[in-house]
């Protein structure tokens, strides 16, 4: 299955979580310090992953992932 590629803030957090839980990876294009970066989100064996250019974040709970998506600006307000 091809990843869902979105711009930061294009989809709401629930839509992103639904895509992840259905088995899709989500690639979020975001801008940081005047350059474009891609963050890859995935869900595997009950764990959510946010693979950024500088580190890999893990979230065990759905609520934690929702908070991360909103806090980092990956999801729409």
What are these regions (language model features)?
Residues 31-54, 72:
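Short aromatic-glycine-(Arg/Gly/Cys) micro-motifs in beta-strand/loop hairpins
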């Amino acid at each position: 299955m091809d990843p869902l590629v979105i711009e930061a803030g294009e989809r709401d957090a629930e839509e992103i979580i639904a895509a992840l839980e259905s088995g899709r990876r989500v690639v979020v294009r975001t801008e940081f310090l005047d350059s474009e970066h891609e963050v890859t989100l995935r869900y595997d064996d009950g764990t959510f992953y946010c693979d950024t250019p500088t580190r890999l974040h893990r979230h065990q709970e759905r609520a934690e992932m929702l908070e991360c998506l909103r806090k980092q600006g990956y999801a729409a307000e």
